[in-house]
């Protein structure tokens, strides 16, 4: 591991939720307004994840008042408070850009069935 990789590894967040493309997530974002800070929730479907390491980012799409809104978040950014997984989605693509053209029920994503392992 060279020096740059070591410095990047130190700055990466350790407690990142293991979400994938197709999952519905709730992202808690720090908003700074003047000298005040607040946390704003942004909930939607993860339609893509890019890059890796400290440069990793993901795109979340939600429908707000009938209009599709997409927001790109750097995964290891200090403005991200938490990323919570609301539901797991079952998709067979790495990028879900086709959801941009779909409306209503056609834009739904199948929910992944979770079967706990019996011990």
From Swiss-Prot:
Alphabetic keyword roster: Ribonucleoprotein, Ribosomal protein
Gene Ontology CC annotations of this record: cytosolic large ribosomal subunit
Family annotation (InterPro entries): Ribosomal_bL19, Ribosomal_bL19_CS, Ribosomal_bL19_sf, Translation_prot_SH3-like_sf
HAMAP family: Ribosomal_bL19
Protein family (similarity comment): Belongs to the bacterial ribosomal protein bL19 family.
Functional summary from the UniProt entry: This protein is located at the 30S-50S ribosomal subunit interface and may play a role in the structure and function of the aminoacyl-tRNA binding site.
Protein name, per record: Large ribosomal subunit protein bL19
Originating species: Pelobacter propionicus (strain DSM 2379 / NBRC 103807 / OttBd1)
Originating gene: rplS
């Amino acid at each position: 591991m060279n020096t740059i990789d070591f410095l990047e590894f130190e700055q990466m967040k350790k407690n990142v939720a293991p979400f994938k493309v197709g999952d519905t997530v709730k992202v808690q974002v720090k908003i700074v307004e003047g000298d005040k800070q607040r946390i704003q929730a942004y909930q939607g479907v993860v339609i893509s994840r890019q890059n890796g390491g400290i440069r990793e980012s993901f795109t979340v799409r939600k429908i707000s008042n009938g209009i599709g809104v997409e927001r790109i978040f750097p995964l290891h950014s200090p403005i991200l408070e938490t990323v919570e997984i609301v539901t797991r989605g079952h998709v067979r693509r790495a990028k879900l850009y086709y959801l941009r053209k779909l409306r209503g029920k056609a834009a739904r994503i199948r929910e992944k069935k979770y079967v706990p392992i019996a011990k």
